[in-house]
Amino acid sequence: MTIAIGQEKTRGGFDLVDDWLKRDRFVFVGWSGLLLFPCAYLAVGGWLTGTTFVTSWYTHGLASSYLEGCNFLTAAVSTPANSMGHSLLFLWGPEAQGDFTRWCQIGGLWAFIALHGSFGLIGFCLRQFEIARLVGLRPYNAIAFSGPIAVFVSVFLMYPLGQASWFFAPSLGVAAIFRFLLFLQGFHNWTLNPFHMMGVAGILGGALLCAIHGATVQNTLFEDGDAADTFRAFTPTQSEETYSMVTANRFWSQIFGVAFSNKRWLHFFMLFVPVTGLWTSAFGIVGLALNLRAYDFVSQELRAAEDPEFETFYTKNILLNEGIRSWMAAQDQPHENFIFPEEVLPRGNAL
């Protein structure tokens, strides 16, 4: 008889931390959680602080701000002034010099939220990838979430980096985002940009595919033993199908003449369309950051300048963009000291 005496492998600090992070608990932490949870907490907390405590001039907290009329649709964390350039505006930096009130006033909170928000989104993407690896799934959820990350980073970081300062990024708020969209249209003719068109096609196409798919599955559910189509008729561990792909295929073949006959191809297409739309939009925003022009029909502009009777969709678009610029520029770029005569500014409900 042979007796082998083995010595237990010593476990280092990394192994102990790895075990603790990946322990089975109600909310999985993981290595990605070290990036996700602090950054998400600070970004959300920073936004709530900026839209309540700071906008009330440091007199109200979260609850009392909303009780006394704070509107989350119009409140926003404003971008730094143009004079700040692309400084990261650290609280301890030369601009704020450790003064929290001064830091908030110069826009440090915006940079804080934008950077922590970006890293928080990346952490959430890594979280999906990490959990997928641990449970043996493919990483397509993480790949899909790269689309929203690309849009956020391109709009809030890449665009202002290509411009003069953080000032040209959108402020962090609902109404502020819509104002930024007007800015993109007036100064970049964004709606006539092919990357924007591909983005719209991807997002609306994804919504259409989602609606069609959900309705089709609901239409072709198998009945349970009581001849009823209830949600109780499904269990996650059942081996049989819960709806009829054959019936769905026949239905759409009659509607369109063609239909998906392969579930794998169908669901990949539902992944591909919106994610591609998000990525193309992000590419387009990077182009705007570099002031690349798209669909400027110079020949039409020249003819319109010579012939007052010449009018096309594009020449009307030029007038719209000029109106947006004259309306926004004076208040949106006060550092430029624009002065427009009263007769050229839009009045009333002109826009």
Swiss-Prot record:
Pheophytin a binds at Q128, N141. It catalyses: 2 a plastoquinone + 4 hnu + 2 H2O = 2 a plastoquinol + O2. One of its GO terms (biological process) is photosynthetic electron transport in photosystem II. A plastoquinone binds at H213, F260. The D1/D2 heterodimer binds P680, chlorophylls that are the primary electron donor of PSII, and subsequent electron acceptors. It shares a non-heme iron and each subunit binds pheophytin, quinone, additional chlorophylls, carotenoids and lipids. There is also a Cl(-1) ion associated with D1 and D2, which is required for oxygen evolution. The PSII complex binds additional chlorophylls, carotenoids and specific lipids. Its EC number is 1.10.3.9. GO terms for cellular component: chloroplast thylakoid membrane; photosystem II. Belongs to the reaction center PufL/M/PsbA/D family. This is Photosystem II D2 protein. It comes from Porphyra purpurea (Red seaweed).
